[in-house]
């Protein structure tokens, strides 16, 4: 098998970065296919902690080709800061990073309009301009990476967009307008620094696959934040599910061999939106502290709750997972009783399928099965047989309920704190 897609199976923050980092050792290419700098992938190598927002996690390995695909919306300023930080730490960027020509760019007016609209309609965005950038993409008004190399095209697009945006900022939001010349100068400066990375990414990826290279597709956020299949409107602005790897990188579904769902051993969510299994007492706070559940991008505390099999069954269905990776199992060490949601109570009915109506989901109560916890530490365990019996029972229940095999179990933050039951590559 030469290709694998890594997908978050919950509301993001499942620990995808570590799994991608681990699997990259066996890969030749790592491709980011959607999202923007609203994602934060944390990877710990030795004593060094890296937080990556745009560049694929594979960049931390030598001689791995990392590609930012056309499905990503890219903030040039954020990317340059990330490149600078990694370079200062001795990471080689120049020969290993490629950016799709038709990747869309986040502009200052995207950030400005999102900041203003979020004041009126609170969804819980990161205020990074992600949504407005995708809006321009769909409306066919977007600025793309390749436009940086054509100053007249860039100037005309900025001017046309500012006519609308400045009108809204001034008349609807009573906010400061933006200067066309200032933005153009800023982005032409970015062009000089980034032009060496611009490439026909889809051609590179397909040639790599066709020649037998191993390619890993790295998703951002999670299934329940998908624009179509998530808890709309409390979602991100892109397709976070496995199908997004094909559209966001330019590859055929026939070229995808494995799809791995990343599942945190409990559930977290950042920002607004329904969360049926949320733990609102001191245990929720304890899990947050143990797991370091604070956003890598915003620093916002994550809401914590029990594992939700209803949401996970939905994720299995829309992604077609061939395997699962369970993360943060060690965070549950020492908790006397564990709960797993197996259904939702809605009125007099028990729902086994994830509701598409947000108003129904908001009124759902979780139906739990309880499990005896384990007192022994699982931290750093690398052999499945050495896990406590109750931890194995917990994992077996997940596997049996979802009818998908668990291939990987993460038992800590560090790269080598991991159990491989079966390699997806």
UniProtKB/Swiss-Prot annotation:
Active site (UniProt): 13 (proton acceptor), 41 (proton donor)
Keywords tagged on the record: Cytoplasm, GTP-binding, Ligase, Magnesium, Metal-binding, Nucleotide-binding, Purine biosynthesis
EC number: 6.3.4.4
Pathway field: Purine metabolism; AMP biosynthesis via de novo pathway; AMP from IMP: step 1/2
Positions annotated to bind IMP: 13-16, 38-41, 126, 140, 221, 236, 300
Pfam family, one: Adenylsucc_synt
GO cellular component terms, A-Z: cytoplasm
Catalytic activity of the protein: IMP + L-aspartate + GTP = N(6)-(1,2-dicarboxyethyl)-AMP + GDP + phosphate + 2 H(+)
SMART domains xref list: Adenylsucc_synt (SM00788)
Name of the top EC class for this enzyme: ligase
GO biological process: 'de novo' AMP biosynthetic process; IMP metabolic process
Cofactor(s) the record lists: Mg(2+)
Binding positions (GTP): 12-18, 40-42, 302, 328-330, 410-412
Gene Ontology MF annotations: adenylosuccinate synthase activity; GTP binding; magnesium ion binding
Compartments, record wording: Cytoplasm
Xref: Gene3D superfamilies: Adenylosuccinate Synthetase, subunit A, domain 1, Adenylosuccinate Synthetase, subunit A, domain 2, Adenylosuccinate Synthetase, subunit A, domain 3
Cofactor: binding details: Binds 1 Mg(2+) ion per subunit.
Binding site for substrate: 296-302
SUPFAM superfamilies cross-referenced by the UniProt entry: P-loop containing nucleoside triphosphate hydrolases
Keyword GTP-binding in record: yes
Binding site for Mg(2+): 13, 40
General function of this protein: Plays an important role in the de novo pathway of purine nucleotide biosynthesis. Catalyzes the first committed step in the biosynthesis of AMP from IMP.
Assembly: Homodimer.
UniProt similarity note: Belongs to the adenylosuccinate synthetase family.
NCBIfam families referenced in this protein's UniProt entry, alphabetically: PRK01117.1, PRK13783.1, purA
Protein name: Adenylosuccinate synthetase
Organism the protein comes from: Thermodesulfovibrio yellowstonii (strain ATCC 51303 / DSM 11347 / YP87)
Record gene name: purA
